[in-house]
């Protein structure tokens, strides 16, 4: 008989939860099925092939201590807070079936008086006076012998904060990654005012056990106990690293231009794996030497202000006669990177 497990995370760290998900998925026997329920504190979660500089307001996230987490699956960028409940269904093949897991989630919600439906894409929706409204999005991953379906449920998320960290000015980024599809969304507390995370988890667990006709005791997952699982520590280190969350970004070009009192500049930065591989600066500045020097020095630097500010400071120190235009350029340039 297939062993059935239910895991509940008591951590709200997105890097921990995503590392748990991936470690369990990789290490579970192919004849096992797992339900994993979790939630994250303030986080922007991006798809595996997305560009965080395009999808997110990274400066605002840093200011507000909002984490960035790149998941293993595709799809778009989403904002998580404690008003979200996340689910992951894992199973070996041929049992793995995302339609079954979707039915289980909907059955759990029906126990709470919420009658959602699956639409033609990968969303769960409700219909109200404003039309069809999305309350859940999903993404999927499959290997040769197993698969998983994970998604998020909007219970009481602060929807106003979506605009704080997503949908930035595009700043002429020409990206090869996937741009998120923005959908109209709704919180489930508009249907059931007292809905909360534990209540939803219990309803989904009950629907899960009923579907498989098994009674399963949930296992509590916490950072204090989980680091002993083989491979987890390395996966957590990867999941929380800058190289994974930013460096895995598909190649892109950042084009920016501005006119200053001393002349105009047009900057092209070719970025791969979070590193500037080529910088080109055009300018009608009377003496273009400082811009030529800057272009040479930008190549090879990490694409963030922490790496770029010292480069400009060093150039100003070496070329004091150009300090005023370089200072003006620096203020504008660093703001564009953010």
Curated annotation (Swiss-Prot):
InterPro entries: aa-tRNA-synth_II/BPL/LPL (IPR045864), BPL_LPL_catalytic (IPR004143), Lipoate_ligase_A (IPR023741), Lipoate_protein_ligase_C (IPR019491), LipoylTrfase_LipoateP_Ligase (IPR004562). It is an enzyme of class 6 (ligase). It is found in: Cytoplasm. Residues 29-216 form the BPL/LPL catalytic domain. GO terms for molecular function: ATP binding; lipoate-protein ligase activity; lipoyltransferase activity. Keywords: ATP-binding, Cytoplasm, Ligase, Nucleotide-binding. Its EC number is 6.3.1.20. SUPFAM superfamilies: Class II aaRS and biotin synthetases (SSF55681), SufE/NifU (SSF82649). (R)-lipoate binds at residue 134. It catalyses: L-lysyl-[lipoyl-carrier protein] + (R)-lipoate + ATP = N(6)-[(R)-lipoyl]-L-lysyl-[lipoyl-carrier protein] + AMP + diphosphate + H(+). GO terms for cellular component: cytoplasm; cytosol. One of its GO terms (biological process) is protein modification process. ATP binds at residues 71, 76-79, 134. Pathway: Protein modification; protein lipoylation via exogenous pathway; protein N(6)-(lipoyl)lysine from lipoate: step 1/2; Protein modification; protein lipoylation via exogenous pathway; protein N(6)-(lipoyl)lysine from lipoate: step 2/2. The keyword Cytoplasm applies. Monomer. Catalyzes both the ATP-dependent activation of exogenously supplied lipoate to lipoyl-AMP and the transfer of the activated lipoyl onto the lipoyl domains of lipoate-dependent enzymes. In the transfer reaction, the free carboxyl group of lipoic acid is attached via an amide linkage to the epsilon-amino group of a specific lysine residue of lipoyl domains of lipoate-dependent enzymes. Belongs to the LplA family. This is Lipoate-protein ligase A.
